[in-house]
Amino acid sequence: YAASVIACIRPNIFYAVPPGIERGQHQAVYRVNLLPNGEQTGNPVQLKSSGLPAYDHAVETAIRRCNPFPRPKDQSATVPRSMQITFDPVEDNANN
């Protein structure tokens, strides 16, 4: 399920990665609280800054744009009440 959520968020992260940044060097971690239908409750909570304020802002904006989160493909699965998601500017840029 996490992969489908990240696939929803990543295309909405608009950030130009500065030269010399390596994978794993700058990671932002957010917690998102969810309703059973995947709708976000409240704002994403930043648990860890990447150290790149513009990237952190781009990630938070992208999380908000992906609302509601996709439903699980397995109809019997439930949406978690809370998710912790890690973002990396190099990884996110490689997949856009």
Regions found by a protein language model. Give the residues of each.
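Conserved "boundary/linchpin" sites in short secondary-structure elements
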Residues: A7-F14, N33-K48, H57-R71, S76-N96
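Surface-exposed patches in mature extracellular/periplasmic domains of secreted proteins
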Residues: V17-I21
